[in-house]
A protein has these predicted regions:
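Bacterial N-terminal signal peptides that target proteins for export
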Residues: 1-9
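Bacterial N-terminal signal peptides
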Residues: 8-19
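Metal-dependent phosphoesterase/phosphodiesterase active-site architecture
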Residues: 22-109, 179-236, 240-263, 305, ...
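Active-site neighborhood of phospho(di)ester-bond hydrolases with catalytic His/Asp-centered motifs
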Residues: 40-42, 105-112, 153-162, 268-272, ...
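Active-site environment of divalent metal-dependent phosphoester hydrolases
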Residues: 47-50, 115-118, 159-170, 232-234, ...
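Core catalytic region of metal-dependent phosphoesterases/phosphodiesterases
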Residues: 62-68, 75-172
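Acidic, His- and aromatic-enriched active-site or binding-groove loops in soluble protein domains
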Residues: 130-149, 179-200, 291-300
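Active-site-proximal segments of metal-dependent phosphoesterases and phosphodiesterases across multiple
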Residues: 233-250, 258-310
């Protein structure tokens, strides 16, 4: 018995030394030396129409024929987040911080605060003109902001606009009035900024939906929040002859990065829609880009020119726990893109949130833990799903690690090895979304950012191996 116990202890120590996670082992949520901790939220898609009491708080009343489901239970798969789901997510991150004696230095939200079909449901279930809808949309966004602020008082929040976060409809450019209202609300959550920096960021947001602010925890480091919806493929003219620089955002980004570089600083980019391939839609037919290819080319050129200035990119939009490797102009790996899972379960994923470790000297992501609410259970509760370093055996999710991990995934399958693990994490634990038939769509999308390179990756994978 003693010999067996000793062998078990040796095995545990060996696995621990390799940074691997034992089944069901809780993550050690403590700052590593030289790190701080932050919270990452994405794709909340809050649905106020699900609750008549919430609608009343927002000054609206549902018409007959638009029954609210109430606020007693979590939404089902295929639905957006209601009040109980969002509150439970925030309660979880607060409780986790208290239990582990950690402090969030800031919160990043990668966009899509508002539910899908937000505008059409307003017309159907409430009614009213453009001005009334603009107020309702901005008030709903402020309601979500208020829930975050109430849960995490005093913690700075840096958020990007999602494609649904508009008073003009999905992917539509928001009105100036909407941007002004949201900007005033968000600017109050940016923490202790110099008055000039706050005013400049608020003015930039009101003008174009983007802004840059100093990182409250890392010296000489900037958060640059982009309105990447302007570059999305839904806007077919974006970066073309008739609209070469939508909203002047590339000029603005170059100016900001130039200022950061001259100061010897660094930056983190935050956006909603990421560049690259839409893996889900590409698996149903022809390859499709998330941005126009012209905007993608300009973005790659911009970041290549400022190599070493941008240290990290955070994005959302696809409602999955994943990553991308952004190439430079020569096609060589340049930067990691960290993609946060969604809180909304509308695409049949479990709700997820992430707690991250950042480097206090560079601002780079050092590690992260994903937490999930398993809606397949009769009485769902939030649980720790995995920590990157323990799950994959890489010390940090940097460019080198993700290059290796993407290769391991590419050579694996959803039923074995690291591929099986990643496939489960991809949908935050809901089951077999990834299959051998669609595997290469999702694997090639991690490393190939253009339609041509994506197609070549799939063709190469389809050839018989020698």
């Amino acid at each position: 018995m003693r010999r067996a116990a000793a062998k078990a202890l040796v095995l545990v120590l060996a696995l621990t030394s390799l940074g691997l996670c034992l089944p069901d082992a809780p993550p050690a949520l403590k700052p590593y030396p030289g790190t701080g901790m932050f919270l990452l939220l994405s794709d909340i898609h809050f649905d106020p129409y699900a609750d008549a009491a919430i609608m009343e708080k927002l000054g609206a009343k549902l018409r007959e024929g638009c029954p609210a489901s109430g606020s007693a239970s979590f939404p089902k798969f295929g639905k957006d987040a209601n009040y109980p789901l969002l509150k439970s997510a925030l309660d979880e991150v607060v409780a986790t911080a208290a239990e582990n004696h950690i402090h969030y230095d800031y919160v990043i939200v990668t966009g899509d605060f508002l539910a899908h079909s937000f505008d059409s449901r307003y017309r159907q279930c409430v009614g009213g003109g453009d001005e009334a809808y603009q107020k309702f949309a901005s008030d709903t966004l402020a309601f979500v902001d208020g829930m975050i602020a109430h849960a995490l008082p005093g913690v700075p929040v840096f958020a990007a606009l999602g494609n649904n976060d508009s008073d003009k409809g999905d992917y539509a450019e928001p009105s100036t009035a909407f941007l002004h209202s949201v900007g005033q609300d968000w600017s109050r959550a940016w923490g202790d900024l110099p008055a000039g920096a706050r005013a400049a960021a608020a003015a930039s947001f009101e003008r174009a939906g983007n802004y840059a602010v100093p990182d409250p925890a890392v010296a000489n480091h900037q958060f640059i929040i982009l309105n990447s919806n302007r570059w999305a493929a839904h806007n077919a003219r974006a970066c073309g002859e008739t609209d070469p620089d939508p909203g002047g955002q590339f000029q603005w980004l170059g100016d900001v990065l130039g200022t950061v570089k001259r100061a010897g600083g660094s930056a983190t980019l935050v956006m909603h829609v990421l560049p690259g391939i839409d893996a889900m839609r590409s698996s149903m037919g022809q390859p499709q880009s998330l941005w126009t290819e012209r905007c993608t080319e300009k973005f790659v050129a911009e970041l290549t020119a400022y190599r070493g200035v941008v240290r990290e990119i955070y994005a959302g939009h696809i409602h999955r726990d994943d990553f991308r490797i952004l190439p430079d102009r020569e096609g060589k790996p340049l930067l990691p893109i960290h993609i946060a899972p969604s809180i909304s379960p509308i695409y049949f994923n479990n709700p997820g949130v992430e707690i991250g470790w950042y480097d206090k000297h560079t601002g780079e992501l050092r590690d992260y833990a994903t937490f999930k609410l398993d809606l397949t259970l009769p009485n769902p509760t939030w649980t720790a799903e995995y920590v990157f370093s323990r799950a994959y055996g890489h010390p940090r999710p940097d460019l080198a690690a993700l290059k290796q991990l993407s290769l391991e995934i590419h050579e694996s399958s959803p039923h074995s090895g690291v591929g099986e693990k990643w496939a489960n994490y991809y949908t935050v634990g809901t089951g077999p979304f990834l299959t051998p038939d669609n595997w290469m769509n999702y694997s090639c999308a991690q490393t190939e950012i253009t339609v041509a390179h994506f197609a070549r990756c799939k063709q190469a994978a389809a050839r018989p191996r020698p």
